[in-house]
Amino acid sequence: MPVVEIYTKTFCSFCWRAKALLESKGVAFQEISVDFGGAEKQRMVERAGGRTTVPRIFIDDTHVGGCDDLMKLEYDGQLDAMIGLTT
């Protein structure tokens, strides 16, 4: 299974939506809180090409974007292959 990482903040509704989609598909993911900034937030910004908003979602170290990007992948039928649910 691919490694899925999602950078989040506690009171972010977009983060909740992205996590809910992944959970509905039974996908295990590592959630990394950036509520308080610091090293984790800096790492997220560096990995995401300077983007500072959350969520920031990575699948196997590839930045796929935020919540809207994840939803578009789902709508376009591409997400399942990326997260290892199809061959």
Predicted regions and their residues:
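Compositionally biased, disordered extreme N-termini, encompassing classical targeting presequences
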Residues: 1-3, 84-87
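Non-catalytic, surface beta->alpha helical segment in thiol-disulfide oxidoreductase systems
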Residues: 59-86
